[in-house]
Amino acid sequence: MMARGPSAILPPFDPRRGRARGRTETAMPPRDRRHDLTEGSIGPTLFAFALPILGGNVLQSLNGSINAVWIGRFLGESALTAVANANNILFFLLGAVFGIGMAATILVAQAMGRHDLAEARRVIGTSATFFTAVSVLIAAAGLPLSRQVLQWMGTPAAALPYADAYLRTIFLAVPFLYLFAFLSATLRGAGDARTPFLFLLLVVALDVVLVPLLVFGIGPLPELGMTGAAVATLLANASSLAALLLWLRHRRHPLWISRAERALFRPDWAIVRTLVLKGVPMGAQMVLISLAMIAMMAMVNRHGTETTAAYGAVMQLWTYVQMPAMAIGAACSSMAAQNVGAGLWPRVDATARAGVGFNFLLTGALIVPLILFDRWTLAVFLPEGSPSLEVARHINHIGVGSFLFFGVTFVLFGVVRATGAVVPPLVVLGLALWGVRVPFANALQPTLGADAIWWSFPASALVAMLLAMAYYRWGGWRRARMLPREEDLAIPSEVPAQPPSPVAEPCPPRARSL
């Protein structure tokens, strides 16, 4: 069968080496085999790579939950409502530059799959400069606008002062948050998920210790209330970012750019163009999600503090439900990108199948106990005897199952983006959120009341999954490119085009993920 595309058909696959014979490789220092995602069995490799990502997400969620317990239990429902509103803004800000970091990560992963260290370092230098400049500009622009944005969201008056104080301090922390996330994602693109996990552990440890000290003014420290939680976030991320940079320098990491090589920080405009053309659509996906979250929060706010507090508590619980899908999707994206760079297309498709199977196994295993025991888990985030508890349980019963659908979408689009196909996932997400979720909730509230908001979650997640599977099956994502190059291999028409079937092709329990 003829290969699609302008170049030759894939070279023969050598199962002994795990890569295509005849592929030119750029010389690079010996690599730790644990960081090479182009070799080994798919299941164990995906599991080993995804496990630290899952651990990192667990740590971040536990950290957020611990902070929510301190704030909700000791500062009251208004303070918890303030955090829920401010965190939606923070998610929007993270989404604004997420795409740039993700595009850089895919470029690094593809270069490492080709064993092209020089290109990986060029990508890191250019994207670090671009990423830093954008994040600083966003933080500077956000500081004077925090109160107006919170008011536009309809933040309850009782929660507004808390949310404003918290959000202003978070804006100061944004550059540190962004740069730490960027370095972590870059290392994962190079196949190292363990190092980002260890430094994230440091972030969480510092934050857990500092939050009560600064919120309540323990010892010589001032009592800062809600602002103390944001100050703790700033200090923890700044300290861990500095530690990570020092570690990279001390280890003389292959991706570390020394002072003598600072010319690599000068923008390579071909890379900048790719970061913008590929990164903006990926960042726009996060922006669409965050805007939809803000729109949903604005609708929830209209139902009063009791419902808003219940929704905030449920969102804390749901962070754990979505972790398997997010970890698997992130692991699949890096793994697929390295294999795309290496020209190993059968491994790309096998990665998607494994990812979808593990999403169903792990997400399903979380949903069941979180329905059965939600009275106790949700009570952790609310004051004792709060009337919000039963509202929160009702929300959870309606919406928690939607994360099975969400997981399939996240995994498939993680693989799809690894080739450089970034616009179709954006279109699908836009249709699901702004064509289904928000209109569904708005249109049916007069009939269903607040239940229309909760039912919009499974409705939109199901639509997104069906569209994602259709694009995976029939879309042209295998022909996409990040940086065009003459030696790019054509995609053979023999590559399987079926969306992974978690029923017909179950994945062995070895490839767990976020």
PLM-predicted stretches and their roles:
Residues 2-50, 108-175, 221-280, 336-402, ...:
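Short alpha-helical transmembrane segments in multi-pass integral membrane proteins
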Residues 37-75, 88-107, 132-139, 174, ...:
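N-terminal transmembrane alpha-helices
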Residues 48-67, 169, 180, 236-240, ...:
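Transmembrane helical elements of multi-pass membrane transporters/channels
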Residues 55, 67-71, 83, 108-113, ...:
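Hydrophobic/aromatic residues within transmembrane alpha-helices of membrane transport systems
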Residues 62-81, 150-157, 213-224, 283, ...:
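Helix-terminus/linker motif at the lipid-water interface of multi-pass membrane proteins
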Residues 80-140, 177-196, 310-374, 406-428:
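Small-residue-rich hydrophobic transmembrane alpha-helices
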Residues 101, 170-188, 196-204, 229-244, ...:
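Short runs within selected transmembrane alpha-helices of multi-pass transporters and secretion channels
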Residues 142, 185, 211, 215, ...:
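Structural signal for membrane-spanning alpha-helices in multi-pass inner-membrane proteins
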